[in-house]
Regions:
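Short amphipathic alpha-helical interaction patches enriched in hydrophobic/aromatic residues
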Residues: 51, 55, 59, 94, ...
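Amphipathic alpha-helical packing segments from all-alpha helical-bundle domains
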Residues: 45-52, 64, 68, 96-121, ...
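Hydrophobic alpha-helical connector segments
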Residues: 38, 52-81, 132-136
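Short secondary-structure transition hinges
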Residues: 68, 74-113, 145, 149
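Helix-turn-helix
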Residues: 2-34, 38
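Amphipathic C-terminal alpha-helical segment
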Residues: 75-79, 108, 112-113, 117, ...
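Alpha-helical elements of Rossmann-like donor-binding domains used by nucleotide-donor carbohydrate transfer enzymes
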Residues: 13, 34, 38, 68, ...
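Short coil/turn segments at alpha/beta junctions that flank glycine-rich nucleotide-binding fingerprints
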Residues: 3-7, 80, 121-122
Protein backbone atom coordinates (compact mmCIF):
# COMPACT_ATOMS: atom_id res chain seq x y z
CA UNK A 1 0.00 0.00 0.00
CA UNK A 2 2.84 2.37 0.71
CA UNK A 3 4.16 2.50 -2.84
CA UNK A 4 0.84 3.30 -4.52
CA UNK A 5 -1.14 4.66 -1.60
CA UNK A 6 -4.46 3.41 -0.31
CA UNK A 7 -6.50 4.47 -3.33
CA UNK A 8 -3.95 3.12 -5.80
CA UNK A 9 -3.75 -0.32 -4.20
CA UNK A 10 -6.45 -2.78 -5.19
CA UNK A 11 -7.58 -5.66 -3.02
CA UNK A 12 -6.48 -7.90 -5.89
CA UNK A 13 -2.93 -6.56 -5.55
CA UNK A 14 -3.07 -7.11 -1.78
CA UNK A 15 -4.17 -10.75 -1.99
CA UNK A 16 -1.65 -11.44 -4.75
CA UNK A 17 1.22 -9.93 -2.71
CA UNK A 18 0.13 -11.77 0.44
CA UNK A 19 -0.38 -15.04 -1.39
CA UNK A 20 -3.90 -15.48 -0.05
CA UNK A 21 -7.39 -15.64 -1.50
CA UNK A 22 -9.88 -12.79 -1.48
CA UNK A 23 -12.05 -14.95 0.79
CA UNK A 24 -9.21 -15.24 3.31
CA UNK A 25 -8.75 -11.47 3.24
CA UNK A 26 -12.41 -10.80 3.91
CA UNK A 27 -12.54 -13.50 6.57
CA UNK A 28 -10.00 -11.50 8.60
CA UNK A 29 -11.02 -7.96 7.64
CA UNK A 30 -14.39 -6.34 7.01
CA UNK A 31 -13.04 -4.33 4.09
CA UNK A 32 -9.91 -2.69 2.73
CA UNK A 33 -10.26 0.17 5.22
CA UNK A 34 -10.32 -2.31 8.12
CA UNK A 35 -7.11 -3.87 6.80
CA UNK A 36 -5.57 -0.41 6.47
CA UNK A 37 -6.51 0.42 10.07
CA UNK A 38 -4.66 -2.71 11.20
CA UNK A 39 -1.64 -1.75 9.09
CA UNK A 40 -1.63 1.70 10.71
CA UNK A 41 -1.94 0.25 14.22
CA UNK A 42 0.95 -2.13 13.61
CA UNK A 43 3.11 0.63 12.13
CA UNK A 44 2.41 3.00 15.04
CA UNK A 45 3.33 0.28 17.55
CA UNK A 46 6.48 -0.62 15.62
CA UNK A 47 7.56 3.03 15.42
CA UNK A 48 6.86 3.61 19.13
CA UNK A 49 9.00 0.60 20.07
CA UNK A 50 11.76 1.72 17.71
CA UNK A 51 11.56 5.28 19.05
CA UNK A 52 11.86 4.07 22.64
CA UNK A 53 14.80 1.78 21.88
CA UNK A 54 16.75 4.25 19.76
CA UNK A 55 16.09 7.19 22.09
CA UNK A 56 17.13 5.31 25.22
CA UNK A 57 20.28 4.06 23.49
CA UNK A 58 21.34 7.54 22.42
CA UNK A 59 20.77 9.71 25.50
CA UNK A 60 23.29 10.37 28.24
CA UNK A 61 20.91 12.18 30.59
CA UNK A 62 17.29 11.18 31.14
CA UNK A 63 16.11 14.77 30.76
CA UNK A 64 17.34 14.69 27.14
CA UNK A 65 14.77 12.01 26.29
CA UNK A 66 12.09 14.47 25.17
CA UNK A 67 14.32 16.36 22.74
CA UNK A 68 16.03 13.31 21.28
CA UNK A 69 12.74 11.42 20.95
CA UNK A 70 10.95 14.29 19.25
CA UNK A 71 13.76 14.82 16.77
CA UNK A 72 13.92 11.10 15.96
CA UNK A 73 10.17 11.09 15.40
CA UNK A 74 10.53 13.91 12.88
CA UNK A 75 13.18 11.86 11.11
CA UNK A 76 10.81 8.88 10.95
CA UNK A 77 8.28 11.12 9.20
CA UNK A 78 10.74 11.43 6.30
CA UNK A 79 10.56 7.70 5.57
CA UNK A 80 8.48 7.35 2.37
CA UNK A 81 6.43 4.41 3.69
CA UNK A 82 5.69 6.13 7.01
CA UNK A 83 4.86 9.33 5.18
CA UNK A 84 2.44 7.63 2.78
CA UNK A 85 0.75 5.26 5.22
CA UNK A 86 0.56 7.35 8.38
CA UNK A 87 0.76 10.95 7.25
CA UNK A 88 -0.98 11.03 3.87
CA UNK A 89 -3.40 8.09 3.78
CA UNK A 90 -3.96 7.73 7.52
CA UNK A 91 -5.95 10.93 8.10
CA UNK A 92 -7.63 10.73 4.68
CA UNK A 93 -8.77 7.11 4.93
CA UNK A 94 -9.48 6.79 8.64
CA UNK A 95 -10.56 10.35 9.38
CA UNK A 96 -8.75 12.66 11.77
CA UNK A 97 -10.42 11.40 14.94
CA UNK A 98 -9.63 7.73 14.31
CA UNK A 99 -6.13 8.57 13.07
CA UNK A 100 -5.41 10.55 16.24
CA UNK A 101 -6.94 7.82 18.43
CA UNK A 102 -4.57 5.23 16.93
CA UNK A 103 -1.51 7.28 17.82
CA UNK A 104 -2.50 8.71 21.17
CA UNK A 105 -1.87 5.76 23.55
CA UNK A 106 1.74 5.13 22.59
CA UNK A 107 2.63 8.76 21.94
CA UNK A 108 1.10 10.06 25.16
CA UNK A 109 2.83 7.34 27.17
CA UNK A 110 6.20 8.26 25.71
CA UNK A 111 5.56 11.97 26.29
CA UNK A 112 4.51 11.48 29.92
CA UNK A 113 7.61 9.39 30.55
CA UNK A 114 9.95 11.95 28.99
CA UNK A 115 8.28 14.88 30.76
CA UNK A 116 8.59 13.00 34.04
CA UNK A 117 12.36 13.29 33.71
CA UNK A 118 12.04 17.07 33.45
CA UNK A 119 10.02 17.02 36.68
CA UNK A 120 12.69 14.88 38.36
CA UNK A 121 15.36 17.33 37.20
CA UNK A 122 13.40 20.24 38.70
CA UNK A 123 12.75 21.83 35.31
CA UNK A 124 8.96 21.41 35.30
CA UNK A 125 6.24 21.25 37.97
CA UNK A 126 4.59 17.82 38.22
CA UNK A 127 1.10 19.24 37.68
CA UNK A 128 2.11 20.42 34.20
CA UNK A 129 3.03 16.99 32.82
CA UNK A 130 -0.46 16.09 31.58
CA UNK A 131 -1.30 19.46 29.98
CA UNK A 132 2.17 19.66 28.44
CA UNK A 133 1.87 16.11 27.07
CA UNK A 134 -1.41 17.08 25.37
CA UNK A 135 0.07 20.30 23.99
CA UNK A 136 3.13 18.51 22.63
CA UNK A 137 0.99 15.71 21.20
CA UNK A 138 -1.06 18.33 19.37
CA UNK A 139 2.05 20.09 18.09
CA UNK A 140 3.57 16.85 16.85
CA UNK A 141 0.29 15.77 15.27
CA UNK A 142 0.00 19.02 13.34
CA UNK A 143 3.66 18.93 12.36
CA UNK A 144 3.32 15.38 11.05
CA UNK A 145 0.24 16.33 9.01
CA UNK A 146 2.13 19.26 7.51
CA UNK A 147 5.09 17.01 6.70
CA UNK A 148 2.74 14.52 5.07
CA UNK A 149 1.32 17.25 2.84
CA UNK A 150 4.66 18.91 2.10
CA UNK A 151 5.71 19.35 -1.52
CA UNK A 152 9.37 19.31 -0.42
CA UNK A 153 9.42 16.90 2.57
CA UNK A 154 13.15 17.25 3.22
CA UNK A 155 13.02 21.05 3.40
CA UNK A 156 9.89 20.92 5.53
CA UNK A 157 11.44 18.40 7.91
CA UNK A 158 14.48 20.68 8.36
CA UNK A 159 12.31 23.72 9.06
CA UNK A 160 10.08 21.81 11.47
CA UNK A 161 13.15 20.40 13.18
CA UNK A 162 14.53 23.91 13.74
CA UNK A 163 11.14 25.09 15.01
CA UNK A 164 10.87 22.11 17.34
CA UNK A 165 14.35 22.86 18.69
CA UNK A 166 13.19 26.41 19.55
CA UNK A 167 10.05 25.09 21.23
CA UNK A 168 12.02 22.60 23.30
CA UNK A 169 14.64 25.22 24.20
CA UNK A 170 11.86 27.28 25.75
CA UNK A 171 10.35 24.30 27.54
CA UNK A 172 13.70 23.23 28.92
CA UNK A 173 14.66 26.77 29.95
CA UNK A 174 17.65 27.04 27.62
Amino acid sequence: MARHGFAGTSTEAIVRAAGITRGALYYQFVDKQDLFRCVCEALVKRLAARLWTETMASIEREEDELRVGFLKLLDYCADPDVRQILLVDGPAVLGMEEWRRLQEPSTMGLLRHALGHLVEAGRMPADQVEPMAHLLFGAMTQASIALGEAIDPEHSRRVYRESLERLLDGLEGR
